[in-house]
Each structure stands twice: as C-alpha cells, then as structure tokens.
C-alpha cells in the first residue's frame, strides 16, 4: 500500500465502533488506508461483520459494506500494531454530590492501556472523544515511548454524520506541531472542509465551547418559555418576531437537552474552574426542564379534574428522526410522571432500545388521558386529520401537550382536543 502524504502512515487502528468510530474507520478504509476497527463489544463486532448495523444513519451501511468488501477494513475485539491509533470511545459524565458533573475518562484511559502494548516509537495517537482541557497531554505523559499525540474532536450531527464528516471544518490540536501535522495528513484524505491546526489544550477547549454556546442559548429559550407561561405570552410567536431583528437568533425551547454532547460537555468546563457560574446555571436550567414539563402536564390535568392519569409519550429519542436515546429528556419526564402516580406508555417510530418499555401507537394511546409530544419526529409533524380521526376513539380524554410546537394545532382543536403548548400561558 502506498503511503499517504509526507508521513509513513499506512495502517490505522480505530478504537471504538460506535456513532463516530465506525463511520470514521469506514471512511478511512474507503480512502485507501488499511484499517483495523476495534470494539470490546463482541456482539457489535459480529453485527458489523454481518452487515447488521444498530446505528440508523443514512448511507452508513453502504459505506461499511464497501470498506469490508474492499478488505481495507477488518473489525475485531482487540487492538494490534498500527502506524496510528484513533480513539473514539464515550466520555460520560459522573455526578458529584452537589449535583454537578465531571468527565469520566475511564473508557478513554482503558483504550490507551489497550494500545500501549502495540505502540512503537514514532506512532501517532489521535483522540476524537470529547475530553476536558489538558487530557491529551495527560495521555502522552502516561506513555513511556517516543510517540505523537493529537486531539481531533468530532463535530458531526446524528442523521448527517457522513455528510458532515466530509464537509465540516476540523480542528486538530497536537502536543507539538508534528503531532498535529501527522493527524492532519490522515484526515485530509477525506475531509473537504478546512483543517485548522493548534495545540491540544486549545482544541479541547474549542469543542467544549461549541457545545456550551449551544447549551446556553437553549437555556435562554427555555427560560423565556417559563416566563411566557407565567405571563400569558406565546413564546414561539415572540421568538419568531424577535428573530426578525438582524442581530437576534433565539433558539427554540423544549423539554430539555439530550444527546451525548450538548447535555454533557459544558460540565467538562465547570469541573476545571470556579469561573463557570453562568455555564453551570444554564446547564442546571436545561437539566430541570423535564421536571418543569412534568409539573406543567400534571397541573393542567389536575385543573381538568384528572388525577392519576394515563399519559401517552410521543418520542423517546433526544432529537427528531434519529434512534439515539442517550441523555434523552424523555427519560426524566417519564421517570417523574411515574413518581407522581401517572401511568405512562411510550411510542417512538425510530427508537429500538429505551430505558422504559416502548409500545405500538395503538397500545400507547389506548385509554389515554393526555398525549405529550417530547420529540420532533417527522412522523409526529405529519399527523393529519385522518390520523387524528383514527386516534380519537382510542383515547379516554382528548388532551395534547406539545413541548416542541410541531403539531398542526388547529387540526387537533377541530377534532375536539384541548391543546397546550410549552411556553404559552393559555390553552
């Protein structure tokens, strides 16, 4: 195999074959590298070998099959010698006693330990996992070899992963310039966006800043929603008009923030400093939105004389049109509804796996007092009059609580529903 660019990197070992690792490994294999994909989950490895992906992502199955059929991608449960190693494992958050959270580096450091026996002088390690500042240097310091280490944080959106892997700009921070340049050589094989070179601390901080910026702006929208609920203003109408200002772009409110990035990453800044009070306040506000939704739903039902209701949850995933339920606000909304005596059924046309039982649509709505929309799936947006007419006879009470403002409310109202919208103080 011919070498790529200025550095003799021919073989790459990708550790972690989840939402980021598998697309990255497959992309590299389809661009001429010899790639070994490693995951400790044997069932996942076997599924990949058999072309049975548990990740719902446009184009991914075709990409993976192409990589495997080309013989450039092999997947297995253990690492082996390579010229470069890319770590794509989760970095979950651990909760502290005060309710704050910190980064759990267990998976990252386990991946490092797994590749140490196979490292040779001159090898490169790239960490794609989101990590707190100074972690890349910490990894380098744990390895007693003359190697190169860089951080190239993933920046893709579920549902558009393959498109964004290619088109998005990337940032690469190295422990030294050569580390960053070596990593750039790998990524420029398929990245069409610009690749920016910096130091590892800056790269770590940039990724956290990106997601913190979004989290804070969502928190602002959620706070506006709570205020508008209180004073009788429709927050969605107010936001739409406010955004007519050329320098204003308020985001939409919702039942909370989910996914493995935005709801987690700001805590990695908070754990490093006492100067992140604003960031922490925003994170706590968003974390408390499921409780606010639960309280609002039960309060409105109580006003109508409905106690211990059966509630139909529409949406288990953290965002629309994906199967990913990680950190989904739906989990906490359901948990709190159950704790307050409600009976809950959940329907999601995309999710296969969830902490609570998933029902068919008919099972979910049978005998229901209230439908609560928590996820903006197209399947929910596209509910039309005929669909509503089919739903009506199966319900006990015609009540809808829309936290995403995606339903055609007039259709539901014409069918006799009471429709409550998050951030609108009146029915």
From Swiss-Prot:
For the ligand (NAD(+)), the binding residues are 19-20, 39, 44, 91, 130, 326
Q: Which InterPro entries match?
A: 6-PGluconate_DH-like_C_sf, NAD(P)-bd_dom_sf, UDP-Glc/GDP-Man, UDP-Glc/GDP-Man_DH_C, UDP-Glc/GDP-Man_DH_C_sf, UDP-Glc/GDP-Man_DH_dimer, UDP-Glc/GDP-Man_DH_N, UDP_ManNAc/GlcNAc_DH
Q: Does the keyword Zinc-finger apply?
A: no
Write the Enzyme Commission number(s) for this entry: 1.1.1.336
Active site (UniProt): 207, 261
Entry similarity comment: Belongs to the UDP-glucose/GDP-mannose dehydrogenase family.
Gene designation: wecC
Subunit and interaction comment: Homotetramer; probably dimer of dimers.
The protein's name in its UniProt record: UDP-N-acetyl-D-mannosamine dehydrogenase
GO BP annotations, alphabetical order: polysaccharide biosynthetic process
Quote the function comment for this protein. Answer: Catalyzes the four-electron oxidation of UDP-N-acetyl-D-mannosamine (UDP-ManNAc), reducing NAD(+) and releasing UDP-N-acetylmannosaminuronic acid (UDP-ManNAcA).
* Keywords recorded for this protein, A-Z: NAD, Oxidoreductase
Which organism is the protein's source?
Answer: Methanococcus maripaludis (strain C7 / ATCC BAA-1331)
Query: Is Hydrolase among this UniProt entry's keywords?
Result: no
Q: Which Pfam families match?
A: UDPG_MGDP_dh (PF00984), UDPG_MGDP_dh_C (PF03720), UDPG_MGDP_dh_N (PF03721)
